Amino acid sequence: AEETCKVIRDCGFDMQLMLGPGLISEVNNPGCPWNKTNYSEEELKQRAERNDRNIDELIRIANENSDVINSVSVGNENTPQWGENNVPIERLISFARRLKEGTGKPVTFNEGVYEWEHLKQLADELDIISIHSYPLWNGNNVEEALEVNKTWYKKVKEWYPGKPIVFSEVGWATDCADFKQMREGQANEENQKKYYEEFWKWSDREQI
């Protein structure tokens, strides 16, 4: 992160960053399909302490690079049932408060659109709602994708009126070996181009 800030500043790039921590799990999650690790209480305590240090480091970097960093994030996809790096909501809330007090920057949290309905306690502490949307992974084709994004954006706006909402992750795969979640034939460069062009046109028009 610090090197990225330096490059932006030294090269005079007209851009700023959202800075977030690399949180690791503070709870065991048997619902994660690919990580069945059962951490001991002592290991979970050590992992929580590591997250606390990461938040402290984030505050330091944000303050030392205030001209380049425009917002700070509490975490990234730390609440889904399938998540590998889940963190209790009360801990995420405490991180949000620490970041707001420690940096003075707008505070956000990055999570999949379908999780935000259940995150009101956390959202109350945030200045910005950052959403991730991947219609292809949810079985939609490229013709449906933009309407899916519009629908989710409208829902999140209804859940949290008055909160700015940004798409912090969007994407369209160009290849996939496993089509269990995707419609076969949809992951290709042509569809990716179409998806991005339609998405940016819509988001620019709506000033999202």
How should these model regions be labeled?
Residues V7, C32-P33, N85-I89, L122-D124, ...:
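Short, glycine/charged-enriched secondary-structure capping and boundary segments
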Residues E3-K105:
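Substrate-binding cleft of extracellular glycoside hydrolase catalytic domains
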Residues I61-E64, K120, K163-S168:
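Short, functional N-terminal and low-complexity linear motifs
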Residues E2-T4, R53-R60, N110-Q121, E147-K155, ...:
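Alpha-helical scaffolding within the catalytic cores
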Residues A1-E2, W172:
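Gly/Ser/Thr-rich loops at beta-strand to alpha-helix junctions
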Residues R97-E101, P106, E125-I208:
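Substrate-binding and catalytic surfaces of secreted/luminal carbohydrate-active proteins
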Residues L19-P21, S25, P30, I69-N70, ...:
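Aromatic- and acid-rich polysaccharide-binding/catalytic face
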